């Protein structure tokens, strides 16, 4: 899946994603998507974090030259979910997971598919070497729908549906996010003790 507003920032982005998706244990692989101003839009999703406790976009609005948490932007790593803005899934695994829920809008559909793949025993991977730009024609109004964690603020019905569907998974916490880190955002900073 590739959002129509994505812009290729490197020639090898598809080969990067394909190289990871060929591994049998990988459900979905996503790339890093940045805004034209050089800040991160999508770089994996952490479960149970953010204002709505559903999922938060990792490193949202931080500079895209950020090294990540312990340098994890320098290597591929598992994440609970990836955005469908830039996502590659084997058709076989997509079909086995039941595909995307047509009742869900963008981002929520990718989040849901990622969790279905994880439930089936697959891992989802962020490949920081697959980089895309995002240039929506109405960027200001488009992104006004997201808060500081990259969560969509005007999609209460979508959020509630996914929180109900995945409540048990979310309650357990994200297996790739240290419990000592803040639950306010997925910037991987220490929480309050």
Model-flagged regions — what are they?
Residues 4, 54, 91:
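Residues immediately flanking
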Residues 6-51:
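Conserved donor NDP-sugar-binding/catalytic core segment of glycosyltransferases
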Residues 7-9, 16, 132-145:
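Repeat-solenoid scaffold signature
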Residues 14-17, 77-98, 103-131:
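A short, conserved alpha-helix in the catalytic core of glycosyltransferases
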Residues 18, 44, 114-115, 163:
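Non-transmembrane alpha-helical segments in soluble domains
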Residues 27, 37-38, 48-79, 83, ...:
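C-terminal, non-catalytic tails of nucleotide-sugar-dependent glycosyltransferases
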Residues 29-34, 127-128, 135:
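Short glycine/serine/threonine-enriched helix-capping/active-site loop
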């Amino acid at each position: 899946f590739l959002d129509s507003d994505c812009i290729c920032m490197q020639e090898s982005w598809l080969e990067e994603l394909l190289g990871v998706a060929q591994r049998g244990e990988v459900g979905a692989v996503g790339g890093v998507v940045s805004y034209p101003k050089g800040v991160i839009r999508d770089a994996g999703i952490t479960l149970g974090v953010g204002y709505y406790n559903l999922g938060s976009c990792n490193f949202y609005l931080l500079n895209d030259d950020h090294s990540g948490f312990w340098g994890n932007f320098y290597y591929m790593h598992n994440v609970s979910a990836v955005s469908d803005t830039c996502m590659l899934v084997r058709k076989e695994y997509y079909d086995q997971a039941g595909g995307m829920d047509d009742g869900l809008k963008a981002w929520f559909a990718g989040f849901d598919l990622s969790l279905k793949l994880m439930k089936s025993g697959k891992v989802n991977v962020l490949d920081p070497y697959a980089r895309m730009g995002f240039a929506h024609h109405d960027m200001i109004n488009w992104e006004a729908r997201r808060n500081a964690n990259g969560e969509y603020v005007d999609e209460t019905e979508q959020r509630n549906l996914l929180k109900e569907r995945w409540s048990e998974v979310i309650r357990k916490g994200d297996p790739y996010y240290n419990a000592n880190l803040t639950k306010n955002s997925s910037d991987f900073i220490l929480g309050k003790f």
